[in-house]
Amino acid sequence: MGRYSGHGGTHTKKKQYKRARSTKNRAKDIDQIFDEIQPETIDKFSKFEVDPDLPGMGQNYCIHCSKHFVTNEDLQSHIKGKPHKIRVKELKTKPYSLAESQIPVDNGVKLNRDANGVPTTTDVTGTIKKSTTTTTTTTTV
């Protein structure tokens, strides 16, 4: 089906405003929250001073979801909810880190060629073996 007349274009101006709103209201990433809930840093991030700019004066805070709530009842109902339980489940596993991304991948046997162009294989142990592939020709009379 085609588009209706008068609805041309991609509405890029709306996309700009949506992008600005989404980046302004962006929540913390899993790896940042994982670092905050470690035993050595949990005291620093779990206690807040009274701040009139935050909801509930900054006293009702869910450390797993990184959200402030207006009342303690709102916090308790949030803890019983599904989004909180999903976030806690995600935080049980260690997040993917930069160091893990830089580990080289070992896929087993690697095929290299020597100076003559003959394929040689290198084992996982590092020993080099020459491949012994021979070609046979058959003649038909």
Swiss-Prot record:
Region of interest (Disordered), ranges: 1-32
Keyword Nuclease applies: no
Compartment(s): Nucleus; Cytoplasm
A biological process from GO: ribosome biogenesis
Basic residues bias locations: 10-25
Residue ranges covered by zinc fingers (C2H2-type): 60-84
UniProt entry tagged with the keyword Metal-binding: yes
Superkingdom per UniProt: Eukaryota
PROSITE patterns on file: ZINC_FINGER_C2H2_1 (PS00028)
Membrane spanning stretches: none
Range of residues in the leader sequence: none
InterPro entries, per database record: C2H2-ZF_Maturation_Protein, Matrin/U1-like-C_Znf_C2H2, Znf_C2H2_jaz, Znf_C2H2_sf, Znf_C2H2_type
A GO term from the CC aspect: cytoplasm
Key words of the record: Cytoplasm, Metal-binding, Nucleus, Ribosome biogenesis, Zinc, Zinc-finger
Family: Belongs to the ZNF593/BUD20 C2H2-type zinc-finger protein family.
Stated role: Involved in pre-60S ribosomal particles maturation by promoting the nuclear export of the 60S ribosome.
Descriptive protein name: Zinc finger protein 593 homolog
